[in-house]
Swiss-Prot record:
It holds the Pfam family URO-D. Gene3D superfamilies: 3.20.20.210. It catalyses: uroporphyrinogen III + 4 H(+) = coproporphyrinogen III + 4 CO2. The lineage of its organism: Bacteria, Pseudomonadati, Pseudomonadota, Alphaproteobacteria, Hyphomicrobiales. It comes from Rhodopseudomonas palustris (strain HaA2). GO terms for molecular function: uroporphyrinogen decarboxylase activity. The gene is hemE. Substrate binds at R28, Q29, A30, G31, R32, D78, Y154, T209, H325. SUPFAM superfamilies: UROD/MetE-like. Its EC number is 4.1.1.37. Homodimer. The keyword Cytoplasm applies. This is Uroporphyrinogen decarboxylase.
Length: 348
């Protein structure tokens, strides 16, 4: 008896095959909007305790899959585990977000450890193995890292800021020191992503949350080029690796991003202009996005219209339905259910 071949709709889209009903998931789908997540988080203690408890991290990764039947699970972790594995002190203050010891001068950058200690991230890899063993074969497992520029913004400032100006200023005033941070993060990210593939990830996503704040010349230098190096480095070892880029806010710079980096897909935020995306981006790679997360708070007819607009704009090509950024903690579960039902009913 021959075994039935299982296809993953998510992988099909990344491989060039449009799906009549687009596969879907949500950025930050394992999060505080879910009561089961809040209960598990309370059991774990701190946010980092949850990230580094393989059993509990696997549990919260699986929770939105059980509840909504998404086509992809993304491992529960954080982009700042890479600085942690580089020996930087990383902590999360309640209500204030991440805190690190800042690398805000060339002398301090000189203290940066250049080699990542992957053993510190073993709980992430173990969580991937657990999730992979429990996921249905047709469900895709996503691993991820932060893009070097975005991670560097937190490392330089020691926290998030409204426009991440400390890192941008260092890049202008001390480009050699800033390049040193980027180089370390590129090599560390390659190693980290390869270990995630080894642990069971099917797809990788590179989150450049702050890339879109850069002007074109700096976007090319600090966003496109480091991402290209990561993609190249991963594929040198794993030639078939499927990789999604998310240079949030890149807008008109997206065509250059996809042409230069070699990603299989790009996530787009809700401000992306649909005609440009269809003509200059989706004609080359798959597109993921791009519902405004605020619509999941609004609900009702506004949410329905937003879902319909995304489907109308992108379903004729290769498309993965997602949000334009992460779901917020105050989004009602019922509104997520409303969105899922509407997307699943679509046959384009």
């Amino acid at each position: 008896m021959t075994q039935k071949l299982v296809t993953k709709p998510f992988i099909e889209v990344l491989s060039g095959n449009r799906q009549a009903s687009p596969p879907m998931w949500m950025m930050r789908q394992a999060g505080r909007y879910l009561p089961e997540y809040r209960a598990t988080r309370a059991e774990a203690g701190s946010f980092l305790d949850l990230c580094f408890n393989a059993k509990l991290a696997a549990e919260v990764t699986l929770q939105p899959i059980r509840r909504f039947g998404f086509d992809a699970a993304i491992i529960f972790s954080d982009i700042l585990v890479v600085p942690y594995a580089l020996g930087r002190a990383v902590r999360f203050e309640v209500g204030e977000g991440p805190r690190l010891d800042p690398l805000n001068s060339p002398d301090l950058v000189g203290t940066l450890n250049g080699a990542i200690d992957l053993s510190k991230l073993e709980p992430v890899f173990e969580a991937l193995r657990i999730v992979r063993s429990e996921l249905a074969p047709e469900t895709t497992l996503i691993g991820f890292c932060g893009a070097p520029f975005t991670v560097a913004t937190y490392m330089v400032a020691g926290q998030g800021t409204s426009d991440q100006h400390p890192a941008r200023l260092m890049a202008y005033q001390h480009p050699g020191a800033f390049a040193r941070i980027i180089d370390v993060l590129v090599e560390s990210s390659i190693q980290y992503l390869l270990k995630q593939l080894e642990a069971g990830a099917d797809v990788l996503q590179i989150f450049d949350t702050w890339g879109g704040i850069l002007p074109p010349r700096e976007f090319e230098k600090w966003c496109i080029e480091p991402t290209r190096r990561i993609v190249e480095g991963v594929r040198k070892v794993s030639p078939g690796a499927k990789i999604i880029g998310f240079p949030r806010g890149a807008g008109a710079m997206l065509p250059d991003f996809i042409a230069r980096t070699g990603v299989d897909a790009v996530s787009i935020d809700w401000t992306a202009e649909p005609n440009m995306i269809r003509e200059r981006v989706q004609s080359k790679v798959a597109v993921q996005g791009n519902l405004d997360p605020l619509l999941l708070i609004a609900g009702g007819s506004a949410l329905d219209q937003g879902v319909d607009d995304v489907l109308k704009n992108f379903s004729a090509g290769r498309h993965i339905f997602n949000l334009g950024h992460g779901i917020t903690p105050d989004a009602p579960v019922a509104h997520v259910e409303q969105m899922v039902k509407r997307v699943r009913a679509y046959k384009g």
